[in-house]
């Protein structure tokens, strides 16, 4: 009995030394509960990400495993290196940009697309190492940051509606309503409403519940074939290490690479600041302890993610659900990472999820991201016009890159045209000029 108590005390002592639980006013039990809570809110990514990257021609079974691995790697590294209750996983939005635009619309091999993700992540890593990253966040106006986030939300929402069959291509009107009497369309819409209703009732696993319910209903209707629950992890050799670094390192993909870098910069940095602020760790300027370590983990996770065959990795805002139940240290993130490793053995379940079951999650994420438009000052046209252009041009041009480019250019035009030059930061002007050069010398040829 005394040996058991000694072992338990030793384990608690190690956790205290690594995570400083008492200093953060928490306990191991609270951190574990917080880890489970965060995991339940974001585990949907292991079902949705393979569906999206499968559009690019990637092996969905292999992507399922690499999604679990990179989520585990990033989350555990964040917990141990930065001691923050923030989990990481492949970014929603950038995965859709990669699959639907870079590969499908631009016609590039997915290996080249992964190369673009890699170079964007390397750029982000360099910005982090040389401390330029936080300077960019501080100097790019809220209207453009919100426009980018909301535009990606509209883009994801459109992809969700398309995958559910709610909207279909129409040569006369571009898009039109699909067959709303089709059971797959109805199940896709049902999945979205399940998420919306459960989330409004503060049920953390709303997305997971929706995917399970719609998949079960699909199975009852014959769309889904039962392949078991537990199995050895599928091989990942078809996706790991197939990144085309040489083919993607060219001027023609500069805009795509920059888009991956810029979006990941805003997405992850904003999430880190938001979650740490909710945990009471950030100061009034948005700075938090071990910020440099957290930004480094975020960057290196994206570099690693491209090599193992998954899209850009980012900090997940769902981490705030774990914070809401008491998560304050990196132990929360480590628990999330361990749970992602365990999920690897549930690959048959991931293979059963039909596209319309994942569509509801896409639409819901679109809603969450688009809601940030409320932060725009709509009374000031020099701020609202660029935000609007940035947001709507992403789905309408079917390109996140073009939306970002036009947003920065319009921002400069509006400020110069109204004589408000003091509102222009060097960062915004430089980015806008780079996009103008891209349009004139690259896109025009």
Question: Which residues does each predicted region cover?
Answer:
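Short helix-coil transition sites and intra-membrane helix breaks within transmembrane domains
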Residues: 40-44, 81-91, 126-127, 202-203, ...
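Helix-coil boundary and interhelical linker segments in multi-pass alpha-helical membrane proteins
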Residues: 51-63, 101-112, 251-254, 354, ...
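Helix-loop-helix hairpins and the membrane-proximal interhelical loops
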Residues: 2-62, 175-177, 208-292, 433-437
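Loop-to-helix transition at the N-terminal end of transmembrane alpha-helices
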Residues: 56-76
């Amino acid at each position: 009995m005394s040996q058991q108590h000694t072992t338990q005390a030793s384990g608690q002592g190690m956790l205290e030394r690594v995570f400083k639980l008492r200093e953060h006013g928490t306990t191991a039990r609270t951190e574990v509960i917080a880890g489970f809570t965060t995991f339940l809110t974001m585990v949907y990514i292991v079902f949705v990400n393979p569906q999206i990257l499968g559009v690019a021609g990637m092996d969905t079974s292999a992507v399922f495993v690499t999604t679990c691995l990179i989520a585990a790697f990033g989350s555990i590294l964040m917990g141990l290196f930065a001691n923050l209750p923030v989990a990481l996983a492949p970014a929603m939005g950038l995965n859709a940009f990669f699959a639907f635009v870079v590969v499908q619309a631009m016609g590039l091999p997915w290996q080249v697309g992964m190369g673009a993700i890699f170079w964007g992540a390397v750029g982000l890593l360099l910005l982090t190492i040389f401390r330029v990253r936080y300077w960019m966040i501080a100097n790019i106006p809220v209207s453009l940051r919100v426009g980018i986030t909301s535009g990606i939300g509209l883009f994801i929402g459109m992809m969700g509606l398309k995958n559910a069959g709610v909207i279909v291509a129409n040569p006369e009107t571009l898009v039109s309503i699909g067959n709303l009497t089709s059971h797959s369309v109805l199940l896709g819409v049902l999945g979205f409403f399940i998420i919306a209703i459960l989330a409004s009732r503060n049920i953390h696993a709303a997305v997971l519940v929706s995917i399970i319910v719609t998949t079960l209903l699909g199975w009852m209707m014959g769309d889904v074939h039962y392949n078991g629950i537990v199995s050895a992890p599928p091989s990942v050799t078809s996706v790991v290490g197939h990144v085309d670094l040489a083919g993607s390192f060219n001027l023609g993909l500069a805009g795509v690479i920059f888009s991956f870098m810029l979006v990941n910069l805003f997405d992850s940095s904003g999430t880190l600041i938001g979650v740490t602020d909710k945990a009471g760790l950030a100061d009034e300027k948005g700075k938090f302890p071990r910020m440099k370590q957290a930004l480094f983990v975020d960057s290196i996770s994206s570099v690693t993610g491209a090599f193992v065959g998954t899209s850009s990795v980012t900090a997940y805002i769902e981490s705030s659900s774990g914070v809401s139940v008491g998560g304050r240290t990196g132990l929360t993130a480590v628990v999330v990472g361990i749970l992602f490793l365990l999920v690897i053995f549930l690959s048959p379940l991931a293979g059963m999820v039909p596209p319309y079951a994942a569509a509801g999650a896409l639409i819901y994420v679109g809603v969450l991201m688009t809601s940030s438009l409320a932060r725009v000052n709509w009374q000031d046209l020099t701020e609202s016009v660029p935000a609007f252009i940035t947001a709507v041009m992403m789905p309408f041009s079917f390109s996140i890159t073009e939306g970002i480019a036009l947003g920065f250019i319009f921002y400069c035009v509006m400020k110069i045209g109204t004589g408000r030059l003091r509102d222009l930061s060097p960062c915004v002007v430089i980015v806008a000029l780079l996009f103008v050069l891209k349009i004139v010398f690259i896109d025009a040829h």
